[in-house]
Structures are given as structure tokens and as C-alpha cells.
């Protein structure tokens, strides 16, 4: 007795046997290319931004799931660094626990893989003021948080400091002033 193999008998074309020439992709004839090309990120907000408004802007080689450096709140109460850490957590954004003084934050974040540049992009971006910049400490610098980016490119901040007893204040910077600052995105 000879076994029949699949190539030994005639088959009907797919269009005849199934009534269609359309294939299926896991139960659907439509392939969601956006899902196939999406950049993975474990943080939901970061995932939305890297696959949405920032898709064509992120630096080459940027990895959204870089090490965050977050080991818990390590900043002294009411310091600018305490507020930046606390506010980022409130907004569900990554932030490191040991970035140093305000003026050191951009370099510390960059070393861990954060996207840092001089363009405010989203509510929650950390603003890094260099030593003495816009009234910041000439020794320590300063950090704040972007709360709003206005249509004209100006930004509204939330900031704290030791003398404020944990009560943040707000300032507005023009687009030209904002362009002189550094921003930690995610």
C-alpha cells in the first residue's frame, strides 16, 4: 500500500475552496500596522508620547524603557528636587532618586538614558536651571516642572524651595527664555 501525500492529488484553488482570495491575519483580513511598528514602553504615558506626538522627534537610539534611577524619594522636603520628584510621580512619569542638585539633573538624567534637550514638549517635563539662571541658586541651580505650554511657546511652571515649606509656586517664561533652559522629558 502506498501512502498518499498532499502533492499527489489535485487541489482546488483557494478562491474556489473558500470563496475568496482574501487571507486572514489572526482572524481578521486587516493588519494593524500601527501596532506592528509601535515603540514599546512600559510606562503608559511614555508609550503614548513616543508613538504619538514625539514619534518623529525622539533621538536616534533612544530607549523608552531605560533605567530610571528611581529607588524612592531621597530628596529633602520642600527642596526644588523634592517637588520635581513628587510632581513627576503624581503625573505618572519616570524620575531618578539621586540626580543631585538642580543644576546636575540634566547630566544625571542623560547618563541614565533620559531624553534631555532645550525644547519643552509636555506637561511634566522637568525644567533644569543652571547655577544663577533666572534667579536660581548660584551654588545649586534649580529644577521645576512644566505645567503648561502655551500656544506662543511660553511655559507655566510649578516650583518649590526650602523657604516655601512644601507649597509650590508658579512662574511663566517666554518662549525665548524657555529655549535657554534644559528639559528632561522621559
Where are these regions (language model features)?
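Aromatic- and glycine-rich peptidoglycan recognition patches
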Residues: 147-186
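Intrinsically disordered, low-complexity
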Residues: 1-90, 94, 172-186
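Secreted/periplasmic proteins that engage bacterial cell-wall peptidoglycan
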Residues: 43-143, 148-150, 159
Amino acid at each position: 500500500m502506498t501512502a498518499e501525500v498532499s502533492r499527489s492529488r489535485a487541489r482546488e484553488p483557494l478562491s474556489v475552496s473558500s470563496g475568496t482570495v482574501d487571507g486572514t491575519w489572526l482572524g481578521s483580513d486587516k493588519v494593524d500596522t500601527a501596532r506592528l511598528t509601535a515603540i514599546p514602553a512600559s510606562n503608559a504615558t511614555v508609550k503614548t508620547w513616543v508613538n504619538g506626538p514625539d514619534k518623529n522627534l525622539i533621538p536616534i537610539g533612544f530607549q523608552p524603557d531605560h533605567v530610571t534611577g528611581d529607588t524612592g524619594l531621597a530628596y529633602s522636603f520642600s527642596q526644588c528636587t523634592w517637588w520635581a520628584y513628587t510632581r513627576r510621580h503624581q503625573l505618572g512619569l519616570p524620575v531618578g532618586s539621586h540626580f543631585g542638585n538642580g543644576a546636575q539633573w540634566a547630566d544625571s538624567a542623560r547618563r541614565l538614558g533620559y531624553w534631555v534637550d532645550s525644547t519643552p514638549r509636555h506637561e511634566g517635563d522637568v525644567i533644569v536651571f543652571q547655577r544663577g539662571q533666572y534667579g536660581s541658586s548660584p551654588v545649586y541651580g534649580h529644577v521645576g516642572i512644566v505645567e503648561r505650554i502655551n500656544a506662543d511657546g511660553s511655559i507655566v511652571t510649578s516650583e518649590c524651595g526650602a523657604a516655601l515649606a512644601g507649597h509650590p509656586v508658579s512662574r511663566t517664561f517666554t518662549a525665548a527664555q524657555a529655549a535657554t533652559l534644559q528639559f528632561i522629558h522621559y
